[in-house]
């Protein structure tokens, strides 16, 4: 049952990242990560196989026409919500979306440090755009304190002074 196992693995990873999003104390809004389910989790493996096989058969003609698979793990979506507001991220302001993304990023970094016992290399593009001063300061402190190797690209130097003492700036 590769689709079910893949789905379960994705859910396990998302739940682990969610644990760290909830655990880490930052001024960034807590993101809530949810994966839409393709099939009811309460059905047994045999019934799942029957339903999945029938669904694949039913979609064959559509798959041929579109030249792609229209049913499967590739159709699972990650849904992100602003936890405190109980609002889908796609309906949040650009600044809130950026803050939610940073919340997810920090959660993923902390989960990765715990699971893999490694620290990732951070690549951040236009890091401080759409953030208020308090969040800029908090993010700069996180980057500095995390001791992660970090590459930040920016078109505007405003905000980068928060971390220049701890790093090196290369002008291109």
Whereabouts are the PLM-identified features?
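H-loop/switch region of ABC-family ATPase nucleotide-binding domains
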Residues: 153-155
